[in-house]
């Protein structure tokens, strides 16, 4: 049986089960849009897209992006997919005296508690997450929110 035929059959079964699927094709289209916006802003970013299991589907490194941003972008996508919330929202819940204080020390330190990670949905169902790193906190947060909006409009 043809591999593409199998992939289409699996995607159809998942859709019928009421689940959303993050495909490599969707991830690449999203990354392209976020990269263009980052270029407009003068940001050299690393952009990561994860599936609902918080596993990377695609990672893109813009030229001259910070080396450390690679793991940070992956971990932002991991955090948003794994906790089903943006990393900006998590930052509110993870401060001193808040219910999730200290969560960044779990999961082998992969939980990120600052902006740049967003949950991605298709028709109200979670398909995965986006992580962006390389700019300021505000730039990463903006680019991730932009990516979420673009994705949900049908990348």
Language model segments and positions:
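Flexible, solvent-exposed loop/hinge segments and secondary-structure transition points
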Residues: 2-155
């Amino acid at each position: 049986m043809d591999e593409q035929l199998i992939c289409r059959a699996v995607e159809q079964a998942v859709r019928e089960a009421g689940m959303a699927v993050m495909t490599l094709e969707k991830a690449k289209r999203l990354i392209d849009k976020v990269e263009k916006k980052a270029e407009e802003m003068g940001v050299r970013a690393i952009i990561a897209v994860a599936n609902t299991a918080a596993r990377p589907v695609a990672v893109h490194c813009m030229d001259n992006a910070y080396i450390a941003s690679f793991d940070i972008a992956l971990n932002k996508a991991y955090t948003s997919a794994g906790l089903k919330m943006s990393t900006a929202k998590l930052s509110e819940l993870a401060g001193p005296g808040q219910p999730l204080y200290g969560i960044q020390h779990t999961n082998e330190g992969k939980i990120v508690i600052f902006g740049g990670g967003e949950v991605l949905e298709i028709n109200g169902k979670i398909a995965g997450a986006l992580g962006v790193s390389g700019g300021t906190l505000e730039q990463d947060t903006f680019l991730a929110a932009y990516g979420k909006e673009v994705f949900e409009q049908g990348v």
